[in-house]
């Protein structure tokens, strides 16, 4: 079984590579110093993954083996405890017998035999204190045989006329207490029966035993076997049900827990943990209030406003980043390529953010913004953001250089205070608000492409860590000029020592085979004979790993961009870059697309609008630490088969260049860089294969690729890296296959290996090995602990069960336990009926027929048969509904009081039958009870005596004749006690009381009978009377039966307790699961959340294409005039509270069945974005597309009018004058989820961009739409007013329409 905290990977030669890979429980991975080869890490991870899969395949067999072993050990442990109890009982009985024998002058031989029996019991009991004694079946069988034969023989010899009574107790022990199988117990019982028969024959005069008495004793011992086997069968069945039921419950519990954990991970991937905890607390309070209202109690938390989950944080730094010229690129990508490119690109930014302790907030179009200092205050928040900005610029620079696409980053940073949290009731997205956020947004707008633009406040926190120059942001942004913001530009740190090698690196899909050595050589020869002329085949710099001393050195996040940064800095580090940055800086004034701007994020005039084209991605928190550790401590080491002789220039690849030093596998001799316009002469040549296998190279962004794929679960099949073997750059016969720039962009960013959304939701080992996990939990919670004698903790945990009564300390739980239906009560009645028949057979064989005997047996038989018929008339079904539980058997099984009444009646009848016929042997008054006075009668012929004697003489003769059968009544008493114990679920205390009452009453009746009085006078000259001796032996039987009853009660109660705890825990998990489901549906569409919760699909990128979707943006432009940060409104918190009320009321409309087809996408400050027509799953290709198109548009217009009505109502209540400005459009869209740290569901397309522009260039109080959408609305009966040609930013002049609503012209 794989350890949850560590995995041992297999090396190539089959030996264990200890410390090769350590995976911590929280997902973080650390790399040992001895393991710096990335290729070896990939091989090790692949081996470990295959080992996991192999173990999972073998899990079923191992699970069955473990379960069978657990069940065997469970029964053996219980049987072992019973064995100890039986030995203790025999030891106690022998000690009491020895004491009585000494007091009454018992024969020395019998006393010595009893001493021997006590020694045997004590010795075996002592030996059992060692756990290894009964570890083997042979040892258990040996102890069982020794115990049985020794105690049985001694009981037969010392028992005299009552020998069957101790034998009865022994038979019960053989079948129910000895640690042997039931066939062995049956064989032992037969042997002991044979020994008893031989002993009876041997001790009889002239070897002629009283055959009726002998047959009666045999039947009695057979009834003991019936009783013992019944207890064993039922207890084994109960144990089996306990193990199976507990296992099922635990498996369900584990599955629910794992599902809840996945939902929790999914939830925490979107919103911070403290926000999620606060929201859960609010939901639980609402659930509690709902329960109180349902119970008729008054609500305790009535409030007029919705819960506001927003907090204020001071001293944080906000970073806004915009990708320059990304819109033309995204418009040329397919749906899958767009989602993949966005996920990889913004996923890389998320990785950089996490490495620099920044929290990404949201992605708006190609605008990416994050904050450092949330939710945990960090002193280095300003430094973190600047470092992140520099690394983002470096990352996008390599995209530009590798693909030839002119993209860049413009970054603005400001330090101040923020309000952060979530607004509304549905589709939460963590966001920040404040005037400082607005300023940071304008710092980006007024920034310079390829530079980090900061304010004076940020510079004050930076100190002298970075060199700056005047930013003059006011010349590029009016907001900065109006507020007289002093800005600066960070001077990029100088590159450290790097060696640029012209390379093109591509990622091959996981199912593509890796190139063989021959293929690699062929590719190398082809590349050496041709020159690449495509401008896109640019040079990809390769950083050579430093010596091991530098590799092992740890870096701080702030040292990445310093001039002294180590050579092995990651891709985004400025220290690893050596190619000259392109100097072109694009002006964004004519950027093609934009969306409605967020309050305090974008200007409302549309100048700096950003469209919602992309949402970022980030790896899980646990995985990022692993990636960061690998990126800072190791370089990528390619396998020998993949290493090529590397050198080249701008025009192609050649084998000329400086030879690598063979003395140091990590060293490379660089050559001088060629002048601009000439061929670059930097080269790196790899020597022989053994030498190449030790060569360490660092390809940007790829050295943590393996660890990220392994941690995200996508590394199972292995992802191959190939140089010059990709689909786009494979050379054939002197031709070079070229891709579009957008395709190259997709291929390049894919090599970064950014995690898929929700990649942290990986199948845990608890789910993989759920059977073994449940068995382990059963073993730790259900298997009784090993105990020593007199350790009463075995009889129940003191915290849950009372030590002697074993009743639950929790009264309601005790009531629940007693109210359980007993579906096996009918089997108890059957066993009691069989024991009654045994009692009747004994009496009919031994006792002469008389009216009292026949009457008692017949009455009891009829009553028991009636009870048996009623309880078996219809099979009880506890799963049936209440109305279906009308059969007699179901009523009996369900009614505890009815079962109790039947228990009392049955046992009174059986106990009475055991002694009732003794009344037939009563000496008439005035007649002497001395047997000697009637000697002549006894010696004469019965017929002549009957003729010549009086009636009194005849009765006295009958009594004298029946004197030898007196012990039979005690045998019948033993059978009646077993019948009482046969009712397994009636409570061991109740049965103990019933047995004691019955035996006392029976012995009292027998003791006062003339038969026993005459027997004592005739056969006992010294010692205890027969009834007293029988009473003591019956007490031994009671003690044995009580031990069995107590054990059965203990097992039943612990099973019920464990299941009750499981049920409570399961309900708690169900509650949290329900809460998480509510939260998930408030964040992602239900079908999207279901998609990512399926483990086999959790690593896939989710995207859907729709041909006709209506998109709407509804903003409140004059809300920014209302927002103000003063002490009166708690620095803007109360302003956000009103906005939260507005959005919550908007969200409530989505709960109406009429608007169930509308999906809220997100809110951007005071802008509400939603869409209609996003059906779950792939588009179903509706036959009536025109009708579907019309429905999507019309329902969204009705929703817009409902929004206007809601806002108008809020205005009247809050004395405000808010107005909606709505933009509407319809057409094809792409829906998908991107990002790993905080995945976002979003939609992209020109349809979305135009809908956003319809809002931003619209008029307050009006609903503006495009011409095509207006035509559909007019066909549906809506009146539209043509606005004419309207300038739309990025689209030129478009004909737009206003849809008339009841709120047009309303102030």
UniProtKB/Swiss-Prot annotation:
Residues 232-828, 1045-1307 are cytoplasmic. The chain crosses the membrane at residues 85-105, 113-133, 137-157, 178-198, 211-231, 829-849, 851-871, 900-920, 963-983, 987-1007, 1024-1044. Residues 317-444, 1110-1255 form the Guanylate cyclase domain. Mg(2+) 1 binds at residues 322, 366. Its EC number is 4.6.1.1. Its main location: membrane. Keywords: ATP-binding, cAMP biosynthesis, Cell membrane, Glycoprotein, Lyase, Magnesium, Manganese, Membrane, Metal-binding, Nucleotide-binding, Phosphoprotein, Repeat, Transmembrane, Transmembrane helix. InterPro entries: A/G_cyclase, A/G_cyclase_CS, AC_N, Adcy, Nucleotide_cyclase. Its cofactor is Mg(2+); Mn(2+). Glycans are attached at residues 934, 941, 948, 1019. Pfam families: AC_N, Guanylate_cyc. It comes from the Eukaryota. GO terms for cellular component: plasma membrane. It is a multi-pass membrane protein. It catalyses: ATP = 3',5'-cyclic AMP + diphosphate. One of its GO terms (molecular function) is ATP binding. ATP binds at residues 322-327, 364-366, 410, 1162, 1242-1244, 1249-1253, 1289. Binds 2 magnesium ions per subunit. Is also active with manganese (in vitro). GO terms for biological process: adenylate cyclase-activating G protein-coupled receptor signaling pathway; cAMP biosynthetic process; instar larval or pupal development; intracellular signal transduction; negative regulation of multicellular organism growth; response to starvation. It is an enzyme of class 4 (lyase). Belongs to the adenylyl cyclase class-4/guanylyl cyclase family. The protein contains two modules with six transmembrane helices each; both are required for catalytic activity. Isolated N-terminal or C-terminal guanylate cyclase domains have no catalytic activity, but when they are brought together, enzyme activity is restored. The active site is at the interface of the two domains. Both contribute substrate-binding residues, but the catalytic metal ions are bound exclusively via the N-terminal guanylate cyclase domain. Catalyzes the formation of the signaling molecule cAMP in response to G-protein signaling. This is Adenylate cyclase type 2. It comes from Drosophila melanogaster. The lineage of its organism: Eukaryota, Metazoa, Ecdysozoa, Arthropoda, Hexapoda.
């Amino acid at each position: 079984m794989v350890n949850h905290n560590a995995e041992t990977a297999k090396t190539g030669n089959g030996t264990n590579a200890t410390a090769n890979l350590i995976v911590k429980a929280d997902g973080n991975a650390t790399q040992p110093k001895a393991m710096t080869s990335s290729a070896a890490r990939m091989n090790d991870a692949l081996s470990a993954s295959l080992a996991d899969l192999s173990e999972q395949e073998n899990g079923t067999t191992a699970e069955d083996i473990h379960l069978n072993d657990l069940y065997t050990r469970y029964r053996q442990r219980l049987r072992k405890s019973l064995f100890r109890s039986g030995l203790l009982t025999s030891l106690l009985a022998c000690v009491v017998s020895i004491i009585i024998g000494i007091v009454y002058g018992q024969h020395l031989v019998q006393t010595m035999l009893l001493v021997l029996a006590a020694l045997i019991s004590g010795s075996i009991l002592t030996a059992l204190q060692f756990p290894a004694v009964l570890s083997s079946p042979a040892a258990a069988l040996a102890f069982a045989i020794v115990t049985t034969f020794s105690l049985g023989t001694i009981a037969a010899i010392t028992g005299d006329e009552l020998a069957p009574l101790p034998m009865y107790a022994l038979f019960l022990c053989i079948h129910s207490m000895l640690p042997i199988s039931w066939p062995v117990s049956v064989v032992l019982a037969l042997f002991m029966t044979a020994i008893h028969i031989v002993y009876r024959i041997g001790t009889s005069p002239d070897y002629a035993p009283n055959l009726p008495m002998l047959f009666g004793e045999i039947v009695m011992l057979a009834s003991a076997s019936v009783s013992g086997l019944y207890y064993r069968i039922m207890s084994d069945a109960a144990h089996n049900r306990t193990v199976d039921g507990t296992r099922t419950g635990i498996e369900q519990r584990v599955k629910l827990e794992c599902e809840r954990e996945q939902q929790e991970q999914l939830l925490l991937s979107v919103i911070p943990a403290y926000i999620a905890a606060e929201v859960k607390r609010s939901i639980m309070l609402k659930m509690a209030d709902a329960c109180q209202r349902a119970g008729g109690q008054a609500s305790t938390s009535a409030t007029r406003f919705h819960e506001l989950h927003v907090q204020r944080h001071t001293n944080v730094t906000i970073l806004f980043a915009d990708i320059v010229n990304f819109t033309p690129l995204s418009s040329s990508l397919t749906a899958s390529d767009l989602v993949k490119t966005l996920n990889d690109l913004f996923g890389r930014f998320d990785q950089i953010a996490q490495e620099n302790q920044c929290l990404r907030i949201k992605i708006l179009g190609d605008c990416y913004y994050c904050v450092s200092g949330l939710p945990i205050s960090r002193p280095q928040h300003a430094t973190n953001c600047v470092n992140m900005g520099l690394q983002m610029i470096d990352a996008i620079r390599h995209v530009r250089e590798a693909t030839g696409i002119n993209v860049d980053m413009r970054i603005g940073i400001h330090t101040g205070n923020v309000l952060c949290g979530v607004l509304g009731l549905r589709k939460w997205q963590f966001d920040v608000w404040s005037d400082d956020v607005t300023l940071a947004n304008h710092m980006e707008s007024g920034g310079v492409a390829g530079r980090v633009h900061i304010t004076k406040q940020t510079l004050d926190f930076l100190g002298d860590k970075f060199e700056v120059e005047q930013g003059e942001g006011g010349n590029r942004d009016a907001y900065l000029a109006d507020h007289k913001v002093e800005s600066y530009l960070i001077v990029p740190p100088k590159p450290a020592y790097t060696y640029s090698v012209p390379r093109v690196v591509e990622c091959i899909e996981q199912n593509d085979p890796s190139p063989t050595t021959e293929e690699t050589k062929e590719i190398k020869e082809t590349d050496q004979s041709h020159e690449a002329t495509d401008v896109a085949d640019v040079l990809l710099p390769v950083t050579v790993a430093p010596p091991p001393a530098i590799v092992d050195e740890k870096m701080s996040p702030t040292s990445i961009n310093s001039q002294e940064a180590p050579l092995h800095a990651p891709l985004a580090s400025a220290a690893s870059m050596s190619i000259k940055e392109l100097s072109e800086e694009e002006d964004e004034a004519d950027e093609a697309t934009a969306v409605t701007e967020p309050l305090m994020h974008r200007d409302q005039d549309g100048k700096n609008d950003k469209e919602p084209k992309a949402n970022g991605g980030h790896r899980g928190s646990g995985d990022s630490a692993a990636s960061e550790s690998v990126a800072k401590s190791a370089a990528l080491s390619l396998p020998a088969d993949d290493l090529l002789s590397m050198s080249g220039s701008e025009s192609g690849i050649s084998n000329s260049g400086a030879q690598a030093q063979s003395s140091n596998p990590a060293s490379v001799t660089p050559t001088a860089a060629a002048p601009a316009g000439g061929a670059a002469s930097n080269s790196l040549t790899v020597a022989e294969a053994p030498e190449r296998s030790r060569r360490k190279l660092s390809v940007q962004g790829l050295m943590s690729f393996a660890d990220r794929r392994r941690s995200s679960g996508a590394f199972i099949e292995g992802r191959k890296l190939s140089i010059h073997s990709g689909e786009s750059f494979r050379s054939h016969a002197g031709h070079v296959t070229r891709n579009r720039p957008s395709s190259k962009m997709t291929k390049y960013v894919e090599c970064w290996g950014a995690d898929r959304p929700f990649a942290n939701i990986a199948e845990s080992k608890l789910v993989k090995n759920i059977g073994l996990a449940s068995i382990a939990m059963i073993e730790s919670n259900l298997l009784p602990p090993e105990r020593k004698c007199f350790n009463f903790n075995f009889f129940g945990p003191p915290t849950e069960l009372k030590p002697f009564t074993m009743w639950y300390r929790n009264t309601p739980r005790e009531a629940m336990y007693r109210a359980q239906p007993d579906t096996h009560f009918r089997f108890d009645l059957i066993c009691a009926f069989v024991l009654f028949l045994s009692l009747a057979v004994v009496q009919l064989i031994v006792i002469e027929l008389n009216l009292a005997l026949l009457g008692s047996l017949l009455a009891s038989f009829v009553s028991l048969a009636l009870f048996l018929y009623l309880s078996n008339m219809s099979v009880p079904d506890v799963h049936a509904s209440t109305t279906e539980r009308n059969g007699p058997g179901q009523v009996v099984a369900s009614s505890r009081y009815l079962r109790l009444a039947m228990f009392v009646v049955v046992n009174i009848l059986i106990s009475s039958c055991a002694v009732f016929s003794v009344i037939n042997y009563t000496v008439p008054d005035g007649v002497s009870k001395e047997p000697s006075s009637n000697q002549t009668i006894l010696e004469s012929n019965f017929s002549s005596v009957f003729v010549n004697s009086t009636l009194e003489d005849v009765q006295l003769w009958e009594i004298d004749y029946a004197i030898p059968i007196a012990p039979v009544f005690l045998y019948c008493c033993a059978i009646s006690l077993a019948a009482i114990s046969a009712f397994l679920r009636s409570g061991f205390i109740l049965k103990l009381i019933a047995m004691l009452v019955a035996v006392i009453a029976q012995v009292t009746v027998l003791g006062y009978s003339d038969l026993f009085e005459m027997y004592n006078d005739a056969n006992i000259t010294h010692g205890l009377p027969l009834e007293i001796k029988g009473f003591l032996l019956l007490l031994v039987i009671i003690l044995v039966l009580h031990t069995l009853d107590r054990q059965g009660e203990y097992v039943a109660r612990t099973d019920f307790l464990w299941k009750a705890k499981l049920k409570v825990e399961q309900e708690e998990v169900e509650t949290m699961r329900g809460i998480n489901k509510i939260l998930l549906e408030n964040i992602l569409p239900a079908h999207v959340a279901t998609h990512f919760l399926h483990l086999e699909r959790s690593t896939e990128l989710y995207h859907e294409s729709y041909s006709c979707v209506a998109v709407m943006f509804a903003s409140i432009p004059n809300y920014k005039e209302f927002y103000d940060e003063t002490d009166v409104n708690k620095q803007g918190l109360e302003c956000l509270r009103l906005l939260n009320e507005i959005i919550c009321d908007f969200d409530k409309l989505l709960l109406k069945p009429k608007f169930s087809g509308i999906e809220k996408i997100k809110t951007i400050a005071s802008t509400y974005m939603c869409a209609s027509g996003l059906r779950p799953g792939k588009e179903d290709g509706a036959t009536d597309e025109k009708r579907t198109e019309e429905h999507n548009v019309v329902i969204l217009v009705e929703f817009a009018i409902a929004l206007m009505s809601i806002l108008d109502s809020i205005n009247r209540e809050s004395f405000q004058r808010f107005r909606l400005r709505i933009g509407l459009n319809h057409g094809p869209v792409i829906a998908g989820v991107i990002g790993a740290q905080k995945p976002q569901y979003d939609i992209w397309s020109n349809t979305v961009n135009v809908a956003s522009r319809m809002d931003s260039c619209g008029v307050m109080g009006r609903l503006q739409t495009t011409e095509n959408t207006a035509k559909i609305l007019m066909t549906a009966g809506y009146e539209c007013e043509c606005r004419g040609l309207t300038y739309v930013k990025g689209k030129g002049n478009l004909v737009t329409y206003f849809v008339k609503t009841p709120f047009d012209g309303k102030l």
